[in-house]
Amino acid sequence: MDFMMANTGATGLDTQAQLMQSAAAAAAVAATNAAAPVQNAAAVAAAAQLQQQQQQVQQAILQVQQQQTQQAVAAAAAAVTQQLQQQQQAVVQQAVVQQQQQQQQQQQQQQVVQQQQVQQVQQAVVAVQQQQQQQQQQQQQQQVVQQQQQQVVQQQVQQQVQQANTNGNSGGAQNGSNGSTETRTNLIVNYLPQTMTEDEIRSLFSSVGEIESVKLIRDKSQVYIDPLNPQAPSKGQSLGYGFVNYVRPQDAEQAVNVLNGLRLQNKTIKVSFARPSSDAIKGANLYVSGLPKTMTQQELEAIFAPFGAIITSRILQNAGNDTQTKGVGFIRFDKREEATRAIIALNGTTPSSCTDPIVVKFSNTPGSTSKIIQPQLPAFLNPQLVRRIGGAMHTPVNKGLARFSPMAGDMLDVMLPNGLGAAAAAATTLASGPGGAYPIFIYNLAPETEEAALWQLFGPFGAVQSVKIVKDPTTNQCKGYGFVSMTNYDEAAMAIRALNGYTMGNRVLQVSFKTNKAK
């Protein structure tokens, strides 16, 4: 383009020079003609023509100048356009470089973040492994402690069994035939229908022989109204077993042979000789927890049958739900030695008919209660076991026996707020007399507390006859207090001493005997 513009400019200059030469020649001619004396028409015409040529030359010069100007402007515009294109290319290249740099920086940052995440994951894995190792070490330590505790309990239980066997043998020799005769006439009858009365039992067993006495064991804390005689005074709900004492041993033996396994209503009764009163057979009642909610009485007996003769068994049912139990049961063996073997073999194990490990403990400890129950307390108060009863337990504030004072009934009015004092005061008048159950008052229970929790809480200390939680009829929740009746005073006292001041479900329990309040 620059070459063409240069050529065009040169051509214009040549044309201009030629025109100027022509004008000069014409001027010379005109001058010559002017000098001549004669002016003719040809000269005038030539002058006019020359003038036109000059004008044409000037116009040509202007055109050439315009062309040159246009060419210069076009060249300048082309140069500016080229410069702009170069600048745009430079800007684009710079933007591309910046974008590449940003991408590299982002990739580097992502790599750093990924490395940090990998490090965090590795640290978390190491922490989890360390935690698992610590948990394994703690579990191993707990297992060692539990094994040591079980060994101590087993040793003491074996000592108690040996001592009981020794005492039983010596006692049998001293009692002579009198003890044997009493044993061979007294029968225990299990699995009686709850609606069956003493008169009906007497009528049934008197068909075999002469009866000296009949006693149906009842729960005095639960009211029972005879549907056939609603006006009759209540004697308490039947516990499903009783005793029949014959005059002659042969009649008692005949009753066992004839009536054992008899079907009455929805029950199959079990008739056997009552156990003699000796140390060898005392305290053979076991408390069992952790049972499946759907376990039947037959399944429970099948677990314990290999260890000895079962006198009676019981599974606590949920109120208003016949298909669900409380997961708690009781097994009474014929001899304490049999119960001991069952504890050693089954406690902490998972039988085939269960899904979780079961807890098997003595429920009715004879004689020196502290010798057997005290070693069991650490295992019972183990947090893993306490979680099953709905709350943690801590060391009591005071382990003294002052709470057993007869003044405890009066102190309830001071300890309990508002209307609960009156309720507790009324409860103290319900304490049974000598020979009956020993009722215990428990205060500061959580609203969601159920009777099963108290069964499991007090069961390991001895035989629990009944449990009652006082509920608000509107909300059907616990009012904050309840009652537990135990059949043995030493066991009840041990339970109070261990549980008063303990915490269950973030609540400190107040546990004391119900006593007759002075009027």
UniProtKB/Swiss-Prot annotation:
- Tell me which Pfam families the record gives: RRM_1
CC terms in the record's Gene Ontology section: ribonucleoprotein complex
Cite the GO molecular-function annotations of the record. Answer: RNA binding
Q: Does the keyword Magnesium apply?
A: no
Entries under InterPro entries matching the protein: ELAD_HU_SF, Elav_RRM1, Hud_Sxl_RNA, Nucleotide-bd_a/b_plait_sf, RBD_domain_sf, RRM_dom
Which Cys pairs does UniProt list as disulfide-bonded? none
**Protein known as:** Protein elav
Q: Which organism is it from?
A: Drosophila virilis
